């Protein structure tokens, strides 16, 4: 039998622990801080380390600059869609789901709801 045990979650960055994985700011830490948002309370996803390192914002300054520009211009829906599209375009490191959007579906939904509240678009 192939058993898989995951403990994914979403919450404010300082409120969730990595639990053997990593915490991924749904909107990158740099883009948030450059635009005056708290990175400690910004919603993040607890995810597998390999998945985190495969996200668009991980170590990719061009991606982060695009995020920051969208935030600066208050293009919040476009920013959130960019994050969802990135998850959809990335493969699951475990090969169980087709992509990260499916693997972290509930966590993405949680982040979207919280970021819509934060940005005043809920």
Indicate residue ranges for each PLM-predicted region:
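Catalytic toxin/effector domains delivered as secreted proteins or via bacterial secretion systems
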Residues: 1-122
């Amino acid at each position: 039998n192939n058993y898989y045990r995951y403990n994914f979650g979403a919450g404010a960055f300082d409120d969730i622990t990595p639990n053997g994985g990593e915490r991924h700011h749904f909107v990158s830490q740099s883009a948030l801080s450059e635009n005056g948002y708290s990175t400690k309370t910004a919603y993040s996803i607890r995810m597998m380390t390999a998945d985190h390192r495969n996200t668009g914002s991980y170590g990719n300054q061009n991606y982060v600059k695009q995020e920051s520009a969208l935030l600066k211009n208050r293009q919040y829906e476009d920013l959130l869609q960019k994050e969802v599209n990135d998850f959809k375009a990335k493969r699951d490191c475990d090969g169980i789901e087709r992509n990260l959007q499916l693997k972290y579906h509930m966590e993405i939904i949680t982040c979207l709801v919280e970021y819509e509240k934060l940005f005043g678009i809920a």
